[in-house]
Amino acid sequence: MEKVYINRANILTPFGNSIQANWNELVKGNSAVYKIDSFGHLKNFYAGKIDDEIFLNLKGQVEDNQIYTRLELFGILALQSIIDKSKISKRTAFVISTTKGNIDQLSDSLEKASITNFAKKIANYFRFKTEPIIISNACVSGVLAVNIAKRFIEMDEFDDAYVLALDELTNFVLTGFN
């Protein structure tokens, strides 16, 4: 069995949309976790949140950005720099990990809140030729997604894979920590 390696990665946080931008801030001793006075029903807690100003600056980098939710745009932006340098074939897997996807859309539309629809919108943006593989198992989903992608490649189901792990600060997610 051939070894499987991670050969490209990216990270999108309040520090920026690259590993280097995040590393530079960490080396300086900076933290993206800060006190949030109020968010939904919660008051005075600490979390990492991508502010609206940063989001609006990033949003302009995505074509037809008005048809995507905030979380879908985060997923597209995080993947864009590594997919732009690659080819997606019918043997390329797309594994997406999220706790609840677009759960904040539930009050507007069941369809928008569907994790399946959420994953398909991101997959369609990049023209993946396979159905997205969805892993939804709370905080450990990202590690499971990497493991599953690795196993699919080892089993010769796919030649390569893109793994996207993402969640957003929402009332639902915060309630789980309360």
For each predicted feature, which ranges?
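Glycine-/small-residue-rich "gating" segment that lines the acyl/pantetheine channel
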Residues: 15, 147, 169-178
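Conserved "HGTGT" condensation-loop signature of ketosynthase/thiolase-family condensing enzymes
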Residues: 1-132, 137, 151-154
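Short, well-ordered, mixed-charge alpha-helical segments that flank or form enzyme active sites
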Residues: 102-106, 141-144, 168-173
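Active-site-proximal beta-strand/loop segments in catalytic clefts of secreted hydrolases
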Residues: 9, 165-166
